[in-house]
From Swiss-Prot:
Organism this protein belongs to: Buchnera aphidicola subsp. Schizaphis graminum (strain Sg)
Listed EC numbers: 3.6.5.3
One Pfam short name: GTP_EFTU_D2
Keyword Metal-binding: yes
Protein name listed in UniProt: Elongation factor Tu
Length: 394
C-alpha cells in the first residue's frame, strides 16, 4: 500500500454541555464558539441561534438538540447543547449524541441543584467517560469562601457517582461576561479549551476495536456456503480469520472464508462498511438475524441486565397508560426484537409515559451485549421507550 498523503486534520472529539436549568449551558456554548472563533477561526454562534434547537429523531424519539463546532489549539470539537431538561435525558439515553466527555455547568450563585445530580447520575449510567466542570456566574460572587464551598460540593457529588471528584478540572468563569468580550473572562474560556484538549483523551476509533457485525440477513449460496450480511459496527474482519457467532443460541466458532461488498471480493471488511461474510461449514439454519459475528471472546451473550430507560410520552407516540411490574414488551437490540420482562426499583409501582426510570430486564433469549449497549422498547412494532444497558448481570 502506498503511503497516505499527509492531511492537516485535527483529531475529532464529541462533547456536550450538561447541568441544571438556567445555570448557563447555552450561554457557555455561545461563549465558547465566540471566544475560540476569534483565536482559532470558525464561526461564532449567538445564544438565540443555539437555543432555537431543531428537532431530531433518534430511535423513534423526537429530541431538540443544537450542534455547534469549534476548534481549539489541538482538536476539532462537535458540541451538543439541549434546550430542555427532558431533551437531555432523551439525548443521553438514546445516545443520539454520543459524548467523549461533558462540560458540567454549575452556577456559583446556586451550587449543585437537582438536575445537576441527575445529569451526573445519567452520565455515569450511560457511560459519559469524562466530566469537566465550568463554575459559571463567578462574576456575581465576591466571596472566595463561597466559591470554594460550591467547588467542594460539586467534587463530592462527582465522587458519589464514581467520577474522580478530587481530580476533576473546575474552571471558574462567567459565560455572559466572556460572551460580552471581557478579556479577563474570555481567558477562562481559553482555560476551559485547554482542559478539553488535555483532560479528555482521544477516543479509540471504531476501526481499532474488536470486530463486531450485527447480522441482518443470511443466505445460502450453492457450492460456496452460507453468507451473512450487515454493517460492520467496529473493527476489521479478514479472510481466513476465526469468528464467533454470538447470541440467541449457543455460541459457535467458524472461519471467514470470504468478504464481499457490492459483489466485489475483498480481503477484509472494515468498520462502517456494509458487507457479506462467507462462513466455512456453517449451515443456513444454524444462524439468524439478531445474532452477531464477532472476534472470539470479545463479547458474550446475556439475558439479564440493569438499564436506564426513557418512556415515550403519549404526545411522542408512546403509550397512553402507565405500565406495571411484569410488563413484557419487546426489546429491540441492533437488528432484532426479543421479548423480556421487567422489574422496577423498590417502592416503584408503575411507570408513566414521559418518565425516565432504572429497570432490570430479563430476556427470553440471550443477546450479545456489554454495558453501554442501546436498545428500543417496542410493542407491536411501535417504539414506546428507549434504553441503555447500564450493567450486565447474567
Amino acid at each position: 500500500m502506498s503511503k497516505e498523503k499527509f492531511q492537516r486534520v485535527k483529531p475529532h472529539i464529541n462533547v456536550g454541555t450538561i447541568g441544571h436549568v438556567d445555570h448557563g449551558k447555552t450561554t457557555l456554548t455561545a461563549a465558547i464558539t465566540t471566544v475560540l472563533s476569534k483565536k482559532y477561526g470558525g464561526s461564532a454562534r449567538a445564544f438565540d441561534q443555539i437555543d432555537n434547537a431543531p428537532e431530531e429523531k433518534a430511535r423513534g424519539i423526537t429530541i431538540n438538540t443544537s450542534h455547534v463546532e469549534y476548534d481549539t489549539e489541538l482538536r476539532h470539537y462537535a458540541h451538543v447543547d439541549c434546550p430542555g431538561h427532558a431533551d437531555y435525558i432523551k439525548n443521553m439515553i438514546t445516545g443520539a449524541a454520543q459524548m467523549d466527555g461533558a462540560i458540567l455547568v454549575v452556577a456559583a450563585t446556586d451550587g449543585p441543584m437537582p438536575q445537576t445530580r441527575e445529569h451526573i447520575l445519567l452520565g455515569r449510567q450511560v457511560g459519559v467517560p469524562y466530566i469537566i466542570v465550568f463554575l459559571n456566574k463567578c462574576d456575581m460572587v465576591d466571596d472566595e469562601e463561597l466559591l470554594e464551598l460550591v467547588e467542594m460540593e460539586v467534587r463530592d457529588l462527582l465522587t458519589q457517582y464514581d467520577f474522580p471528584g478530587d481530580d476533576t478540572p473546575i474552571i471558574r468563569g462567567s459565560a455572559l461576561k466572556a460572551l460580552e468580550g471581557d478579556a479577563d473572562w474570555e481567558s477562562k474560556i481559553l482555560d476551559l479549551s485547554k482542559f478539553l484538549d488535555t483532560y479528555i483523551p482521544e477516543p479509540k476509533r471504531a476501526i481499532d476495536q474488536p470486530f463486531l457485525l450485527p447480522i441482518e440477513d443470511v443466505f445460502s449460496i450453492s457450492g460456496r456456503g452460507t453468507v451473512v450480511t450487515g454493517r460492520v459496527e467496529r473493527g476489521i474482519v479478514k479472510v481466513g480469520e476465526e469468528v464467533e457467532i454470538v447470541g440467541i443460541k449457543k455460541t459457535t466458532k467458524t472461519t471467514c472464508t470470504g468478504v464481499e461488498m457490492f459483489r466485489k471480493l475483498l480481503d477484509e471488511g472494515r468498520a462502517g462498511e456494509n458487507v457479506g461474510v462467507l462462513l466455512r461449514g456453517t449451515k443456513r439454519d444454524e444462524i439468524e438475524r439478531g445474532q452477531v459475528l464477532a472476534k472470539p471472546g470479545s463479547i458474550h451473550p446475556h439475558t439479564t441486565f440493569e438499564s436506564e430507560v426513557y418512556v415515550l410520552s403519549k404526545e411522542e407516540g408512546g403509550r397512553h397508560t402507565p405500565f406495571f411490574k411484569g410488563y413484557r414488551p419487546q426489546f429491540y437490540f441492533r437488528t432484532t426484537d426479543v421479548t423480556g420482562s421487567i422489574e422496577l426499583p423498590e417502592g416503584v409501582e408503575m411507570v408513566m409515559p414521559g418518565d425516565n426510570i432504572k429497570m432490570t430486564v430479563t430476556l427470553i433469549h440471550p443477546i450479545a451485549m456489554a454495558d453501554g449497549l442501546r436498545f428500543a422498547i417496542r410493542e407491536g412494532g411501535r417504539t414506546v421507550g428507549a434504553g441503555v444497558v447500564s450493567k450486565v448481570l447474567v
